[in-house]
Amino acid sequence: MKKNPKISLIGSGNIGGMLAHLISLKNLGDIVLFDVAEGIPQGKALDIMQANTLAGSDIKIKGTNDYKDIEGSDAIIITAGLPRKPGMSRDDLISVNTGIMKSVAENVKKYAPNAFVIVITNPLDVMVYVMLKESGLPHNKVIGMAGVLDSSRFNFFLAEEFKVSTNSVSSIVLGGHGDAMVPLARYSTVKGVPIPDLVKMGLSTNERIEKIIDRTRNGGGEIVALLKTGSAYYAPAASAVEMLESYLQDKRQILTCAAYLQGEYGVKDLYAGVPIIIGKNGVEKVIELQLTTNEQALFDKSVDGVRKLIEAVK
């Protein structure tokens, strides 16, 4: 990857602005901040660059309303679309955001066909599928931000439960980025010790872990209900930057993301949250975990929900 990659952010709302801030603090590359609303990306770009003078970052940020400015991008993160409001599920956004995603995909195809694309817009698993099909980009270069965020929430709740640092917790959340996601306690650990073993030691109970799993599934909804006028943006932005960094720096991290499946986990031609290796080629490998019968059934149920939503937009 070249010394100063070009990173385009499509959508300059709360997540888009936070992405620009985090990317510039990490000096990952120069940024194009795009939005259809005049003045918003330009104002945020100016504000963030002025903040960067205090952080020692010389990253350049261009605010724009012209898609041509994304030309030649090395990586693109898409947040454009309506956010959730209290009482809404991610799936309620499907009609409006599908139209927006198709428009974005056309411009990505036109101006940045070699970019690595991360989709954040909800309903995530459908939007990333629309991006793949409409843009014509290779599937290893189009992924969705889901599992990194869901796992970070699961990690946080588990760290609270066991009263340990979040750095000691590692977890995996599979499936669609929705209410039927599958947090896997069996594959989640505290300093290498699986959660079921910690339960056997008397450090928690199965009932408490199930409550944590339910809270993880509703993690986004909990924040929407508290904010009342928007949805989460700090953690989603941080999650996408983790994925971006692994690609730009060829870190080959194992991260749970919405990836295009071609038979893995018994699923074909769909996106679902699974562990993948992200390196300089995008998705380097899909890691197929051995699931129990019950875990596979939960995963299948989650994926079936995604499949039905995709049929609705075809």
Swiss-Prot record:
The keyword Oxidoreductase applies. Its EC number is 1.1.1.37. The keyword DNA-binding does not apply. One of its GO terms (biological process) is tricarboxylic acid cycle. It comes from the Bacteria. InterPro entries: L-lactate/malate_DH, Lactate/malate_DH_C, Lactate/malate_DH_N, Lactate_DH/Glyco_Ohase_4_C, Malate_DH_type3, NAD(P)-bd_dom_sf. NAD(+) binds at G11, S12, G13, N14, I15, G16, D35, N97, I120, T121, N122. It catalyses: (S)-malate + NAD(+) = oxaloacetate + NADH + H(+). Keywords: NAD, Oxidoreductase, Tricarboxylic acid cycle. Gene3D superfamilies: Lactate dehydrogenase/glycoside hydrolase, family 4, C-terminal, NAD(P)-binding Rossmann-like Domain. Catalyzes the reversible oxidation of malate to oxaloacetate. Belongs to the LDH/MDH superfamily. MDH type 3 family. This is Malate dehydrogenase. The gene is mdh.
